[in-house]
From Swiss-Prot:
InterPro entries: WD40/YVTN_repeat-like_dom_sf, WD40_repeat_dom_sf, WD40_rpt, WDR55, WDR55_POC1. Residues 386-400 have a biased composition (Acidic residues). It comes from Oryzias latipes (Japanese rice fish). It comes from the Eukaryota. Its main location: nucleus. Keywords: Nucleus, Repeat, rRNA processing, WD repeat. Disruption phenotype: Death between 8 and 10 dpf due to multiple defects in organogenesis. Thymus primordium fails to accumulate lymphoid cells. The head, the eyes, the liver and the gall bladder are smaller. Pharyngeal arches are abnormally shaped and lower jaws are malformed. In contrast, hematopoiesis and development of the gills and the gut, as well as body axis formation, are not disturbed at 7 dpf. GO terms for cellular component: nucleolus. Nucleolar protein that acts as a modulator of rRNA synthesis. Plays a central role during organogenesis, including thymus development. Residues 11-25 have a biased composition (Polar residues). This is WD repeat-containing protein 55. The keyword Disulfide bond does not apply. GO terms for biological process: chordate pharynx development; eye development; head development; liver development; rRNA processing; spleen development; thymus development. Belongs to the WD repeat WDR55 family.
Length: 400
């Protein structure tokens, strides 16, 4: 950008030569406006830009040590992206079309060098993360479409299918050393304890299954719950197990008390399809209603809304390697990023605050109620005023 006219040199306007006995002009010229001369740099955003896909993504996984994500879609394609908060720098790295039918789940190995995917075509694929090339394939790994996938360790893989069969694989041999069917419907999710000894499965038949990897045997099924159990996660340093359901209820089990629930919590959502632990007490859940909720466990409380895919069912959520972002994919064919670093510092007291009069959730991110920063700012200011008014009312009531 050219310098403004007022900063241009004026020496050419002098017509008379200077006198020989005059003092030299030692004054420094005014510096040019640095803002005017410097090129405008790329915009730095709070979160990476949304990624628009060609088809609905069923699954999204994030690299364990880099700003890279992978998603699998209903066409069977797998895509890898490098994401960045610098505008315009989020880009596709590679794509793979080796699955013949819908890709149901993708997962990185712990070292981030391998990627595993399962599909409705009943196959298990291993891909090279750097190039996206197919390394190995297990055709016909299940008799039915595979729905869920878990990496137990660098060599052990667990898969669950639409008919309720669980298989545990030794990937060094490409063979399953556990092949058990104790569910009457699809296996929706799989989790493992920190000792890598006990596998937990949730199913559309409304039960949670418990399997012992070390002894290679089935242990027990929980009592039946109303509706499908859709997700499972360990909380409270492994002392609690939480299961989401198709009816919007979170069921809570004590560790080693898997037969019956110790507690339950109605989230008032259409469903609780995905659960991602953020801290020992706080988890994020995703629902068919398009909302991502932050929930505190014991005391059981919906803290607020992390974000939403407006009116679109969310398929999966996962957090980034540095726990800065939560990433979601939904039926709007978008992958969205949500800032959650402040959520880790959140504490919930036993005191239950008065519910908002209009029933809406508290927004926990600037994008929670939409991408318009102006209106989201107004929402935040309104919520702060409401909280201050509530605190004043509570203090007045305490003083009476």
């Amino acid at each position: 950008m050219a310098a403004p006219p007022e900063h241009a040199a004026t020496g050419s306007e002098q017509t008379d030569p200077p006198e020989t006995n005059s003092e030299p002009d030692l004054s420094q010229p005014e510096p040019a406006d640095s803002d005017a001369d410097e090129p405008v740099g790329p915009k730095i955003r709070e979160t990476p830009e949304d990624i628009r896909l060609e088809a609905i993504a069923n699954t999204v996984a994030l690299h364990p040590s880099r700003d890279v994500l992978v998603c699998g879609d209903v066409d069977g394609d797998v895509y890898a992206y490098a994401y960045s908060c610098t505008e315009g720098e989020t880009r596709e790295l590679w794509s793979s079309g080796h699955h013949l039918k819908s890709c149901r789940q993708v997962r990185f190995s712990a070292d981030g060098l391998k990627l595993y995917s399962v599909s409705r075509d009943k196959a298990v694929h291993q891909l090279d993360v750097e190039r996206g090339q197919l390394v190995s394939r297990i055709r016909g790994a299940h008799a039915a479409a595979i729905n869920s996938l878990l990496l137990v360790d660098e060599n052990i893989l667990a898969t669950g299918d639409d008919r309720g069969t669980l298989k545990v694989w030794d990937m060094r041999k490409g063979e399953a050393f556990m092949d058990l069917k104790h569910h009457d419907d699809y296996i929706s999710d799989i989790a493992v304890d920190q000792a890598k000894r006990i596998l937990l499965t949730t199913s559309g038949d409304g039960t949670m299954g418990v399997f012992n990897i070390k002894r290679r045997r089935f242990e027990l099924l929980s009592e039946f719950q109303s509706g499908d159990l859709t997700s499972v996660a360990l909380m409270k340093r492994g002392k609690k197990v939480v299961c989401g359901s198709s009816e919007g209820t979170v069921y809570i089990f004590n560790w080693n008390g898997f037969g019956a629930t110790s507690d339950r919590f109605a989230v008032k959502a259409e469903s609780v399809d995905c659960i991602v632990p953020i801290t020992d007490s706080i988890m994020c859940t995703a629902s068919m209603d398009g909302y991502i909720r932050a929930i505190n466990l014991l005391p059981n409380r919906v803290i607020g809304c992390i974000g939403q895919h407006v009116g679109e069912p969310i398929e999966e959520i996962n957090k980034s390697w540095d726990s800065r972002f939560l990433v979601s994919c939904a039926h709007d064919q978008l992958i969205k990023f949500w800032e959650i670093s402040n959520l880790q510092k959140t504490t919930v007291s036993d005191y239950r605050k008065r519910k908002k009069k209009d029933g809406r959730m508290k927004s926990l991110t600037k994008k929670a109620l939409g991408d318009n920063d102006f209106f989201s700012g107004l929402v935040e200011e309104t919520e702060k005023k409401e909280e201050e008014e509530e605190e004043e009312e509570d203090s007045d009531s305490d003083s009476d």
